[in-house]
Amino acid sequence: MKYPLMPLVNDLTFSFLVFWFCLPVGLLLLLIIWLRFLLSQDSEENDSSVCLDWEPWSKGPAEFCWKGTLHGQEKERPCW
């Protein structure tokens, strides 16, 4: 097999090939950094707005009773 008359990588094509080989890697790194930034920003916002009261869950099923209205009813629901 004979070699091509002009090599694939020379002074003219080297920068072109480096650009097209490095572009996907650079875009992938940029995408990873951007997604990590978005995920960290989302978790910071959710931490400040979420307030969970775990006290009712620590009680037994007979001790916890929901005292509120259901679908606009005025009287409270009885405890079990």
Curated annotation (Swiss-Prot):
Entries under InterPro entries matching the protein: Adipogenin
Residues passing through the membrane, by range: 14-34
Source organism superkingdom: Eukaryota
Record key words, sorted: Membrane, Nucleus, Transmembrane, Transmembrane helix
Lyase is among the record's keywords: no
Example GO BP: spermatogenesis
Claim: Transcription regulation is one of the keywords in the record: no
Membrane topology: Single-pass membrane protein
Cellular component annotations (GO), alphabetically ordered: cytoplasm; lipid droplet; membrane; nucleus
Record localization: Membrane; Nucleus
Family, per entry: Belongs to the adipogenin family.
PANTHER family recorded: ADIPOGENIN
Role this protein plays: Plays a role in stimulating adipocyte differentiation and development.
Protein name: Adipogenin
Source species: Homo sapiens (Human)
Source taxonomy: Eukaryota, Metazoa, Chordata, Craniata, Vertebrata
